[in-house]
Curated annotation (Swiss-Prot):
Mg(2+) binds at residues 71, 139. Keywords: ATP-binding, Glutamine amidotransferase, Ligase, Magnesium, Metal-binding, Nucleotide-binding, Pyrimidine biosynthesis. CTP binds at residues 13, 146-148, 186-191, 222. GO terms for molecular function: ATP binding; CTP synthase activity; glutaminase activity; identical protein binding; metal ion binding. GO terms for cellular component: cytosol. Belongs to the CTP synthase family. Homotetramer. UTP binds at residues 13, 186-191, 222. It comes from the Bacteria. This is CTP synthase. GO terms for biological process: 'de novo' CTP biosynthetic process; pyrimidine nucleobase biosynthetic process. Gene3D superfamilies: 3.40.50.880, P-loop containing nucleotide triphosphate hydrolases (3.40.50.300). Pathway: Pyrimidine metabolism; CTP biosynthesis via de novo pathway; CTP from UDP: step 2/2.
């Protein structure tokens, strides 16, 4: 039976439960344990796939095509375990499962209730996702006191009651605000948050105290006294300059030792080797170069909408000790402009998106990068914008467009995918009447790269696999016409039916590459990703006037 660490939050949301949990997981992994993570979200949506990026941030996609909370992105950036749809569960999915069972008659005529049926389903999902691991960390979304979270909290209370402290730990993240007028930290919100937890039968084993500054020992003792938590288990989590340094900070305070002692794992663990995280922090703090990248998107007012893109760009810089400064530009604002906002930029990235708002701004951005020889990296919608730009302005296909935005376009160079083969070999079919939720081409898909192309050079191999999330695709009827006009199709699906990557010849542009996949989902701070590393290097070369010293490379 896998030992479980349940991570809850109190006082306010957005304190960083996901980062804290992932940091602890990375330490346990560094000590030789097989670790997994899970997110329980209290919203009633079945998954975040149809939620607005302005409300929820990005939708993170796993290998098996699950559309999940962005916290799973944090998890995979900190631990080596690849997650799946089992690791992201919402209230909507729980109720959907229970109602389906009720309709089948699985409950044999019983009155279906929150307790035991909903809580039993939550526990079943937890068991399914965590089986076979040495330790599992499970984050409960929201804040203690929210009515939506109650079934999840009741379920984990039951788990602790049945399994005991050696198999279930409660870790509570709470706010210790600093009141500038008084010049002191206030522990009362934390006391009340723990009181709220205890009122529903949960006594925290560990408190993570988030604050602007380190919580002094005197305040830690006070918190321990009022919350019935060991002083050793009251951990200070102050703001830090480099988030990827959180594993080092938690290790310094012995959080992993608390877990190992409570779960009696001493004979299974080794000494923690956090040298990779030390190297990451050192690269962030001591860069040797600096570039400015413009991200031209549709949801830039909510930067969590592009969380993985922003992190992947930073990772690309880390691998070559380069600080990446991001300039966020709203695509719609560039429509009809003189593109002055892009002057002095070392590289341009156009990320994914949906709908016609801002699409013309993305097309103009691609045109600007192509004509001014600025390194360009298009992702998903960014690739489609690049194809439309090339079709209109190079291949002379007037009014070329995507059918997502103009169904009457005389040259629909981007169209709806109606049929494709999944990674498991199954054939998926869609039409314009299909539901929006869960109907895209999703998950890890292999593609073959064309020899001699930039894509092949950057990846260093012939076949690669990337995660996808798209409903529209390069229209195959225009392959020959656009290739004859000079566009290079550098990546195709393994069955040759879908265009995966396009680029410009190296003799016409130093670095112009666009992909239908979302490579940002496979980038990590310790390893980076070939496309982002190559893109940042191209930006460095542009800044250096095309001459980059070999010894300055990663």
């Amino acid at each position: 039976m896998t030992p479980l660490i349940f991570v809850t939050g109190g006082v306010v949301s957005s304190l960083g439960k996901g980062i804290a949990a992932a940091s602890l997981a990375s330490i346990l992994e560094a000590r030789g344990l097989k670790v997994t993570m899970m997110k329980l979200d209290p919203y009633i949506n079945v998954d975040p796939g149809t939620m607005s990026p302005f409300q929820h941030g990005e939708v993170y996609v796993t290998d098996d095509g699950a559309e999940t909370d962005l916290d799973l992105g944090h998890y995979e950036r900190y631990v080596r375990t690849r997650l799946s749809r089992k690791n992201s569960v919402t209230t909507g999915r729980i109720y959907e499962n229970v109602i389906r069972k009720e309709r089948r008659g699985d409950y044999l005529g019983a009155t279906v209730q929150v307790i035991p049926h909903i809580t039993d389903e939550i526990r079943r999902c937890i068991d399914e996702a965590t089986a076979g691991f040495d330790v599992a960390l499970i984050e409960i979304g929201g804040t203690v006191g929210d009515i939506e979270s109650l079934p999840f909290l009741e379920a984990i209370r039951q788990v602790r009651t049945e399994r005991g402290a050696e198999k279930a730990m409660f870790m509570h993240l709470t706010l210790v605000p600093y009141i500038a007028a008084a010049g002191e930290l206030k522990t009362k919100p934390t006391q009340h948050s723990v009181k709220e937890l205890r009122s529903i039968g949960i006594q925290p084993d560990v408190l993570l105290c988030r604050s602007e500054q380190a919580v002094p020992d005197s305040e830690r003792r006070k918190i321990a006294l009022f919350t019935n938590v060991s002083e050793r288990a009251v951990i200070s989590c102050p703001d830090i300059d480099v988030l990827y340094g959180m594993p080092l900070e938690l290790r310094r305070q012995g959080l992993d030792e608390l877990v190992i002692d409570q779960f009696k794992l001493r004979d299974k663990v080794a000494t923690a080797d956090l040298s990779e995280w030390e190297a990451v922090v050192d690269a962030v703090k001591h860069p040797l170069d600096e570039v400015t990248i413009a991200v031209v998107g549709k949801y830039v007012d909510h930067q969590d909408a592009y969380k993985s893109v922003a992190e992947a760009l930073k990772h690309g810089g880390l691998r070559q000790r380069t600080k990446v400064n991001l300039t966020w530009l709203e695509a719609q604002d560039l429509e009809g402009s003189d593109m002055a906002a892009l002057q002095g930029i070392d590289g341009i990235l156009v990320p994914g998106g949906f709908g016609d708002r801002g699409f013309e701004g993305k097309v103009q951005t691609s045109k600007y990068a192509r004509e001014h020889k600025v390194p360009y990296f298009g992702i998903c919608y960014g690739m489609q914008a690049a194809v439309v730009d090339y079709a209109r302005h190079v291949a002379d296909l007037d009014a070329a467009n995507s059918t997502e935005n103009d169904r009457q376009s005389p040259h629909p160079v981007i169209g709806l995918i109606t049929e494709w083969r999944t990674a498991t070999g199954e054939v998926e079919k869609r039409d314009e009447k299909s539901d929006l939720g869960g109907t895209m081409r999703l998950g890890l898909q292999e593609q073959r790269l064309k020899p001699g192309t930039l894509a092949r050079e950057v990846y260093g191999k012939d076949v690669v696999a990337e995660r996808h999330r798209h409903r529209y695709e390069f229209n195959n009827r225009y392959r020959t016409q656009l290739e004859d006009a000079g566009l290079v199709i550098s990546g195709k699906s393994m069955d040759d039916t879908l265009v995966e990557m396009v680029e410009l010849p190296r003799d016409t542009h130093p670095w112009f590459l666009a992909c239908q996949a979302h490579p940002e989902f496979l980038s990590t701070p310790r390893d980076g990703h070939p496309l982002f590393i190559g893109f940042v290097r191209a930006a460095r070369e542009k800044k250096a006037g095309g001459k980059l010293l070999k010894e300055a490379r990663a």
